[in-house]
Amino acid sequence: MAKKKKINVSSGIIHVSCSPNNTIVSASDPGGNVLCWASSGTMGFKGSRKKTPYSAGIAADKVAKTVKEMGMATVKLFVKGTGRGKDTAIRSFANAGLSITEINEKTPIPHNGCKPPKRPR
C-alpha cells in the first residue's frame, strides 16, 4: 500500500450538504481538490439516527480535526440543503478553532419548478 503524502494547506473550502436523511461534510483546497470528507453514516450512525443534528456535529468535528492537522487555519463554508444538522455543523467548525471567513447558503430554491414529494402520513 502506498504511503500517503503529507499535505499542508493554509486555507480551504468546506461544503456541508444536509439532506433530510443524512449530512455530508467535505473539505477541499482552494483549487477544488477534495482533501477529506465524512458523513453521518460513516461516523457509525444508521437509519433514523443519521438525520439528527448530533450526528452532523460529529461528522463536522472529524473533518475539522483532520483539516487542522493539515495546517488549515481559514475556511470558507458552503452550506446546502434543508436538513436539521446545518447549524450544528457550522457551530462545530467555529468551536474547533478554525477561522471562518464567509458562510454561503447554496440551497437550491425552485421558482415554481417540479412538484415536491408528498408529505409522509
UniProtKB/Swiss-Prot annotation:
GO terms for molecular function: rRNA binding; structural constituent of ribosome. One of its GO terms (biological process) is translation. It comes from the Bacteria. GO terms for cellular component: ribonucleoprotein complex; ribosome. It holds the Pfam family Ribosomal_S11. Keywords: Ribonucleoprotein, Ribosomal protein, RNA-binding, rRNA-binding. InterPro entries: Ribosomal_uS11, Ribosomal_uS11_bac-type, Ribosomal_uS11_CS, Ribosomal_uS11_sf. Gene3D superfamilies: Ribosomal protein S11. PANTHER family: 40S RIBOSOMAL PROTEIN S14/30S RIBOSOMAL PROTEIN S11. Part of the 30S ribosomal subunit. Interacts with proteins S7 and S18. Binds to IF-3. Belongs to the universal ribosomal protein uS11 family. Located on the platform of the 30S subunit, it bridges several disparate RNA helices of the 16S rRNA. Forms part of the Shine-Dalgarno cleft in the 70S ribosome. This is Small ribosomal subunit protein uS11.
